């Protein structure tokens, strides 16, 4: 894969320990020193996420806690300590990774109800959420259809509809 693999998405990384991911990353970097790994950690407790960004295990993880908070802040129209919590998490991960951690921000993904449905069709709330996560530091990921306000609630077939290219 040396000439072809630059990015790898690693779902549900919590089923392996951080030492395993550190070894995996080292092996990937032997093939391509510029490899970009993104880990999916469904973990609301940021203290339990630290080992995955520590000592070079992963430098990028999807931040599910942040995604939930962004949606909540936008929908409720109240900060509720969000900014101070965010700064605390960024400091914690930055320290643990020797400044190499980059957050991977998103609002929803292929396993979740779509943003516009979560916002109950409120376009202003959806735009507020988008404005927040698109201006945060790190790497932004947009689930297809979010940019045009697609709606959809679980089950999966309702959130994985084809993109309406001609509407």
Question: What do these predicted regions represent?
Answer:
Residues 1-167:
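Active-site and adjacent substrate-binding regions of carbohydrate-active enzymes
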């Amino acid at each position: 894969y040396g000439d072809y693999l630059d990015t790898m998405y690693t779902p549900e990384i919590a089923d392996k320990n951080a030492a395993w991911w550190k070894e995996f990353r080292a092996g990937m970097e032997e093939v391509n020193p510029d490899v970009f790994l993104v880990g999916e950690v469904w973990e609301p407790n940021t203290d339990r996420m630290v080992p995955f960004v520590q000592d070079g295990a992963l430098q990028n993880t999807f931040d599910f806690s942040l995604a939930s908070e962004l949606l909540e802040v936008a929908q409720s129209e109240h900060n509720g300590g969000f900014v101070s919590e965010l700064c605390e998490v960024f400091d914690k991960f930055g320290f643990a990774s020797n400044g190499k951690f980059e957050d991977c921000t998103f609002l929803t993904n292929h396993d979740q109800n779509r943003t516009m449905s979560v916002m109950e069709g409120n376009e202003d709330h959806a735009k507020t959420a988008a404005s927040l996560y698109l201006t945060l530091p790190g790497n932004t990921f947009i689930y297809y259809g979010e940019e045009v306000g697609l709606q959809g609630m679980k089950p999966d077939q309702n959130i994985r509809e084809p993109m309406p290219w001609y509407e």
